[in-house]
């Protein structure tokens, strides 16, 4: 009986491994002191406000932020910046961008070289015209299907296999799909047919 119980426990532990991995993947690591200080410094620079309390009204005046290479892991610290239009978050440690859904005035967003596997959080950003999200691990583009104002989209260096979410983005004039090793040539052909006016860069291997 003891051996049976141990065997059942082992089976259950195997079954739980995918769930544990998923939980680990989805867990958002809070920004450390260095990242928080970098965010505040950039906000103060944009406002020309070196000292004093940063109020909600202050945050509403920020139109652009350059937060490249600031060791940011949690974009939740940006939720108050509801009027920001240009946001650079390249080369950070971000794998969850769901909090960006609050920033609905964004027109240009740069998320290159992070740890993203999906585009959740972008669905509500209907003013977005320029999106650079290359050098991630993207597989799911479903959140992009309603971003019909997009003109420029860089999806290079990801893990894409399905481009169907892009077929109705009729204003796109630049689409970079290079270095997605699992992207079938048939998918690229479908997008070329759906978006005949778009300049598409691709080197499919399948």
Each language-model region and where it sits:
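N-terminal capping/linker segments that flank leucine-rich repeat
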Residues: 2-86, 99, 121, 170, ...
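N-terminal/domain-start segments enriched in small and hydrophobic, helix-friendly residues
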Residues: 155, 162, 166-177
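Per-repeat structural element of leucine-rich repeats
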Residues: 73-74, 95-97, 117-119, 139-141, ...
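Conserved hydrophobic beta-strand positions in leucine-rich repeat
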Residues: 65, 87-89, 109-111, 131-133, ...
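Low-complexity, polar/charged sequence tracts that form flexible coils or short amphipathic helices
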Residues: 78-80, 100-102, 122-124, 144-146, ...
């Amino acid at each position: 009986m003891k051996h049976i119980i141990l065997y059942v426990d082992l089976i259950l532990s195997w079954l739980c491994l995918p769930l544990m991995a998923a939980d680990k993947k989805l867990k958002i690591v809070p920004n450390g002191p260095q990242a928080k200080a970098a965010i505040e410094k950039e906000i103060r620079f944009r406002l020309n406000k070196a000292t004093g309390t940063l109020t909600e009204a202050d945050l509403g005046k920020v139109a652009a932020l350059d937060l490249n290479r600031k060791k940011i892991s949690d974009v939740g610290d940006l939720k108050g910046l509801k009027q920001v239009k240009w946001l650079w978050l390249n080369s950070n440690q971000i794998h969850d961008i769901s909090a960006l859904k609050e920033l609905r005035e964004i027109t240009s967003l740069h998320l290159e070289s992070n740890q993203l596997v999906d585009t959740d959080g972008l669905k509500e950003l209907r003013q977005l015209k320029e999106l650079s999200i290359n050098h991630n691990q993207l597989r799911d583009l479903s959140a992009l299907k309603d971003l019909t104002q997009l003109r420029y989209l860089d999806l290079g260096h990801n893990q894409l296999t399905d481009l169907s979410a892009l077929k109705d983005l009729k204003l796109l004039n630049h689409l970079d799909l290079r270095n997605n090793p699992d992207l079938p040539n048939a998918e690229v052909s479908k997008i070329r047919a759906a978006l005949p006016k778009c300049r598409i860069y691709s080197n499919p291997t399948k």
